[in-house]
From Swiss-Prot:
It is found in: Cytoplasm. Keywords: Cytoplasm, DNA-binding, NAD, Repressor, Transcription, Transcription regulation. One of its GO terms (molecular function) is DNA binding. It comes from Thermosipho africanus (strain TCF52B). Its main location: cytoplasm. This is Redox-sensing transcriptional repressor Rex. The lineage of its organism: Bacteria, Thermotogati, Thermotogota, Thermotogae, Thermotogales. Pfam families: CoA_binding, Put_DNA-bind_N. Homodimer. InterPro entries: CoA-bd (IPR003781), NAD(P)-bd_dom_sf (IPR036291), Rex_DNA-bd_C_dom (IPR009718), Tscrpt_rep_Rex (IPR022876), WH-like_DNA-bd_sf (IPR036388), WH_DNA-bd_sf (IPR036390). One of its GO terms (cellular component) is cytoplasm. Residues 15-54 bind DNA. NAD(+) binds at G89, A90, G91, N92, I93, G94.
Length: 207
């Protein structure tokens, strides 16, 4: 039976990977859990505990080989290959994501953006042209699509998800403020939670 990995651990893996990337670019060959922890503002014991879910890493007294650990995390996270992404919803959030070049650098390649509003169809967003949602079947026939970003109104979200699941999408990043009914992996994003967390820290003078 596969070990269940807590969600906070999964989120921190991406932070570790980004940190190691920067360390490698700085020419640092070996790194200790303490070094990673200090850069991320967490405890070194947390770094070691998180990594232990996936096996043994590093050598006592030497630390981790930066490049080797980065490669291992690439395999674990799944960023050792490119993922094709589409965006559903060409409003402010959807347009910003489709136009964000940082995703491509992290191996998430946005290849299409769709909307049901015909007034938005044909608009150019970055290097993409907005297509009508009715064209999505044909798009899936011609392209391999693995991840969808959902940036649609709450009342349209479930209908869109049902269609995407029918087409064989593998995962969804959901910006709609609704719990989706689906059997595929979903990552819900609510930016208001970050603001609430920040206001909590400000009120209590927490770093």
């Amino acid at each position: 039976m596969e070990k269940k990995i807590p969600r906070p651990v999964i989120k921190r893996l991406g932070l570790y990977y980004r940190c190691l990337n920067r360390l490698y670019e700085e020419g640092i060959e070996y790194v200790a859990s303490k070094d990673i922890a200090e850069r991320l503002g967490i405890k070194s014991s947390q770094v070691r505990k998180d990594l232990s879910y996936f096996g043994e890493f590093g050598k006592r007294g030497v630390g981790y080989n930066t490049y080797e650990l980065m490669e291992r995390l690439e395999d674990i996270i799944g960023v050792n290959k490119y993922w094709n992404v589409i965006v559903i919803g060409a409003g402010n959030i959807g347009s910003a994501i489709a136009n964000y070049e940082g995703l491509r650098k992290e191996k998430f390649n946005v290849i299409g953006i769709f909307d049901a509003d015909r007034s938005k169809v044909g608009r150019k967003i970055g290097r993409l042209i907005v297509k009508h949602f009715s064209e999505i079947d044909d798009f899936f026939k011609k392209n391999i699509v693995e991840i969808a970003v959902l940036a649609v109104p709450e009342n349209a979200a479930q209908m869109v998800v049902d269609k995407l699941e029918e087409l064989g999408i593998k995962g969804i990043v959901n910006f709609a403020p609704v719990k989706l009914r689906t059997n595929i992996p979903v990552e819900d994003v609510d930016i208001t939670l970050s603001f609430k967390s920040l206001s909590f820290k400000i009120e209590r003078n927490i770093e």
